[in-house]
């Protein structure tokens, strides 16, 4: 534990700006009950009763009221952080909150009270076993959720749904490890522990459950991160019109003049709760205009970072030499949707054709639509969801992060190797046991049983101050 993890800390816990209510939160660490009594007297002029709401004045150093509000005292360990906690709930003006914060620091100086770092309250909740690491991350995800679906999924993670699934997997792996260790520890016995206990069947069951958890986690990661979708193509094929149609608002300027869009225009929309970060880019062509060249260079940068590329073509001319040259530069591994726009000028109906694209672009499809009239926009939305791998109506989804997916995939790989060793019977039992141990270690890293201080620092530094 870091030396600073036991310092008394204080921070404004509500968002900056004006509001009806503002909260200053103190977690008293090693200073404990003595500091709670002293600060209650100094700040509120009264001894606060545990778990009672007291309407009191908040006093300055001269004993004059700065504000009046609700004071709450939660003795350890029955608090958010597991330490003695005081919350002062007053009016949400930025000046009065800063005055109250400074008053807390002055009154608590003798106890070593300092300003909290970002995420430090939740870090202490984790260190004091009030939350595991996945639940702690869910606190930040709930605050930052950009859609209702993301908020509900973060709530499920905070409630422990993700952690319970991980703990169940770990328990199963531990039980299987015990069987393997028993066989290794008693090689002279004629009993085949693995065969008698159906170890291979148990391993198959664990792998099946892990695949299900990974599927839910992928869905949750989609809700959290969303999908970056770049509109690319030659000038004047309707990229800005398509952005406006997808967003349902006039965000980009649309003119018949080629090269109108010289820099990216970005907008986040929602489809079934998934944030789609749509990026309209400069038209791709040879040009001598220096400003347009900069925009085109930025377009290729956005394409390199995209999750999906929408390659727009004019439905009247289809795929021409210029379009083929553009398509040849798209990075491998990035799904490309070929969008033939302006079907209102050809009379062709809106449609979807799944074309495939080889191993590198297995999700490639072709959508014919009219961004101007809105024909086929729903078809395009459906294809984006399909490419993302979204399964509508998934009630068990919990929000997940990239580090969770990495750990789950690593555990999956270790269990796959364990299955290979299990087929070799006694000749590879030690390797079987080691792969199970490594799988358990990767699963435990999700909930924080085996986690370095460096990783904790990165995770909690991304929280807001006061949480």
UniProtKB/Swiss-Prot annotation:
Q: Please give the chief subcellular localization of this protein.
A: cytoplasm
Top-level EC class as recorded in UniProt: hydrolase
Where along the chain is Mg(2+) bound? Answer: 240, 261
Where it sits in the cell: the answer is: Cytoplasm
Enumerate the Pfam families for this protein. MMR_HSR1 (PF01926), MnmE_helical (PF12631), TrmE_N (PF10396)
Cofactor remark from the record: Binds 1 potassium ion per subunit.
Molecular-function annotations in GO? GTP binding; GTPase activity; metal ion binding
Q: Which keywords, in A-to-Z order, does the entry hold?
A: Cytoplasm, GTP-binding, Hydrolase, Magnesium, Metal-binding, Nucleotide-binding, Potassium, tRNA processing
Annotated positions binding (6S)-5-formyl-5,6,7,8-tetrahydrofolate: 25, 87, 130, 467
EC number, as in UniProt: 3.6.-.-
Cofactors required: K(+)
Which residues are noted in the entry as K(+)-binding? Answer: 236, 255, 257, 260
Q: Which GO terms describe its cellular component?
A: cytosol
Any GO BP: tRNA methylation
Give the residues the record marks as binding GTP.
236-241, 255-261, 280-283
Database matches in PROSITE patterns: G_TRME (PS51709)
Domain TrmE-type G: residue ranges: 226-389
> Keyword Chaperone on this protein?
no
PANTHER family noted in UniProt: TRNA MODIFICATION GTPASE GTPBP3, TRNA MODIFICATION GTPASE GTPBP3, MITOCHONDRIAL
**Main function:** Exhibits a very high intrinsic GTPase hydrolysis rate. Involved in the addition of a carboxymethylaminomethyl (cmnm) group at the wobble position (U34) of certain tRNAs, forming tRNA-cmnm(5)s(2)U34.
Family under the similarity heading: Belongs to the TRAFAC class TrmE-Era-EngA-EngB-Septin-like GTPase superfamily. TrmE GTPase family.
Assembly information from the UniProt record: Homodimer. Heterotetramer of two MnmE and two MnmG subunits.
Name of the protein this chain belongs to: tRNA modification GTPase MnmE
Native species: Burkholderia mallei (strain ATCC 23344)
| Gene designation per UniProt | mnmE
